[in-house]
A protein has these predicted regions:
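A structural signal for short, well-ordered beta-strand segments
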Residues: 54-56, 71-73, 123
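A short acidic/basic microdomain associated with nuclease active sites
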Residues: 44-61
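Residues at secondary-structure transition points
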Residues: 6, 10, 30, 34, ...
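Conserved catalytic cores of phosphodiester-cleaving nucleases, focusing on short active-site segments
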Residues: 27, 50, 71-89, 100
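Nucleic-acid nuclease catalytic cores
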Residues: 84-144
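Solvent-exposed, charged helical/coil patches
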Residues: 1-49, 120, 125-144
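Short connector loops at helix/strand junctions that flank enzyme active sites
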Residues: 38, 45, 66-70, 74-78, ...
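Acidic pyrophosphate-coordinating catalytic loop
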Residues: 60-66, 120
């Protein structure tokens, strides 16, 4: 197993614990941005570095995409977290997370839906096989 994958896997458990703590205090029914701020605070309290709402710059053969893409949380540069607060997750939510993971070459992602009464029913983990193992160059790339 790759060291970055192992690091992301260990962090995913800590982030899930932090999300459960936020959900225990705030419950379902709030808007996504509130959960994002609370989760970021919970991670700060545990000295887990995370950045929020960064723009993902996408480029393809010299073409830079004008459409801004923003992820919710990047934890310690190896775990991507997308947050939702919706009654029913749309399949596009998982596709969005997977796209960000591919663009940023991140091995593990979490999709967390805080609207669920029991949060464990709203947590999905995704793994990007081969992430962060680039040998050659890609035709497309992304950066923060």
């Amino acid at each position: 197993m790759l060291p970055l994958y192992e690091k992301a896997d260990a962090l995913s458990r800590k982030v899930i614990g932090a999300a459960i703590e936020v959900h225990r205090h705030k419950g379902p029914g709030l808007i996504e941005s509130i959960y994002e701020r609370c989760l970021l605070r919970e991670l700060e309290l545990h000295s887990i570095p995370a950045t929020t709402q960064k723009i993902v710059r996408v480029e393809y053969k010299g073409l830079v995409f004008d459409e801004p893409l923003r992820f919710d949380l990047l934890v310690d540069d190896c775990l991507l977290v997308e947050l939702k607060a919706v009654e029913l997750l749309h399949p596009s939510s998982k596709a969005q997370l997977f796209s960000y993971m591919k663009l940023l070459d991140i091995p593990i992602g979490l999709l967390i839906n805080f609207h669920e009464p029991l949060l464990k029913n709203g947590i999905f983990q995704m793994v990007l096989p081969g992430a962060n193992q680039k040998e050659g160059s890609n035709d497309s790339q992304a950066s923060l």
